[in-house]
């Protein structure tokens, strides 16, 4: 029940923000906005101001904006109607919907980086059979402190450094065990796996998994958080348009790459259990994707 309500709330936020973008651009362009509704269906209540009816409706599944003369059947040629505007103004009205979604995503990412987010540490939780780490003697509870001489403090550092050195057959790995630093040579297993866009990527694997029960909270200053928030927004945007290009060009299956409403609901249900920061991150990802 809670997951359903959260899912409806998220969809509502995304749609309302999108429609509010159209609303702002229409007002700035001199187009008469006949109605701005939060929700669909029967009206619960409404007020009218400056020729615009503001309504709250019964079905909380987003909302909509009704512009004067936004279809040819109703178009009368009045100067404040949608189709009376030059094409650049009409484009601006359409464009501002997704722009405001991007702004929402950026703001949420910015807040997350400011408030703090959990990062998995460098502690090993599991060592897998058949990989170099097991053969070299790494055990659960060890901390990976360095790879190829580069200091690593989080699991993300470990993954990134391994991939930077994935062409090497062996890696020099520093570990902390019972207060003592040890240096091990670990064979790297070469493999390839599909990335987020379904493209094959060469990977190097040590055969270790993190201890998911140990995390640290990472926070950044306001300006640094703004930079990281902007960067994450741009990165997700690039990934989204790359995926669209791959789908159009036939390099990526639409079925395998597009998550439908059921998939979104399942992900939302899982994210809801992880707390407000994870939920904000999910909303931001949806907003810019």
Question: What annotation goes with each model-predicted range?
Answer:
Residues 2-76, 288:
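Small-residue-rich helix-interface/hinge motifs
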Residues 4-8, 12-16, 20, 95, ...:
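Generic alpha-helical transmembrane segments of integral inner-membrane proteins
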Residues 29-34, 116-134, 139:
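Alpha-helical transmembrane signal-anchor/signal-peptide segments
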Residues 52, 120-123, 140, 169-171, ...:
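Envelope-exposed proteins and targeting segments
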Residues 59-129:
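Internal alpha-helical transmembrane segments
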Residues 81, 85, 128, 193-289:
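Functional transmembrane alpha-helices
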Residues 133-155, 233:
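Conserved PDZ fold ligand-binding element
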Residues 139, 145-146, 161-201:
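PDZ-domain C-terminal substructure recognizer with occasional recognition of PDZ-binding tails
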């Amino acid at each position: 029940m809670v997951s359903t309500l959260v899912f409806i709330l998220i969809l509502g936020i995304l749609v309302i923000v999108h429609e509010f973008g159209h609303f702002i651009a229409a007002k700035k362009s001199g187009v008469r906005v006949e109605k701005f509704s939060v929700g669909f269906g029967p009206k619960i209540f409404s007020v009218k101001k400056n020729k615009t009816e503001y309504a709250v409706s019964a079905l909380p599944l987003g909302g909509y904006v009704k512009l004067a003369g936004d279809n040819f059947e109703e178009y009368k040629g009045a100067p404040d109607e949608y189709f009376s505007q030059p094409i650049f103004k009409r484009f601006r009205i359409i464009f501002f919907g997704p722009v405001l979604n991007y702004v929402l995503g950026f703001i949420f990412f910015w807040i997350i980086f400011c408030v703090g987010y959990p990062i998995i540490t460098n502690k090993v939780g599991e060592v897998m059979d058949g990989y170099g780490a097991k053969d070299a003697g790494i055990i659960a509870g060890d901390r990976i402190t360095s790879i190829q001489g580069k200091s690593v403090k989080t699991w993300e550092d470990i993954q990134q450094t391994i991939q930077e050195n994935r062409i090497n057959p062996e890696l020099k790995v520093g570990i902390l065990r019972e207060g003592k630093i040890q240096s091990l040579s670990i064979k790297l297993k070469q493999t390839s796996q599909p990335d987020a866009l379904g493209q094959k990527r060469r990977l190097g694997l040590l055969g270790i998994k993190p201890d998911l029960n140990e995390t640290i909270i990472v926070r950044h200053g306001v300006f640094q958080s703004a930079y990281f928030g902007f960067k994450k927004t741009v990165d997700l945007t690039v990934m989204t348009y790359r995926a669209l290009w791959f789908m159009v060009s036939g390099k990526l299956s639409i079925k395998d790459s597009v998550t439908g409403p059921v998939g979104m609901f399942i992900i939302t249900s899982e994210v809801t259990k992880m707390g407000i920061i994870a939920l904000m991150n999910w909303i931001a990802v949806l907003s810019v994707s």
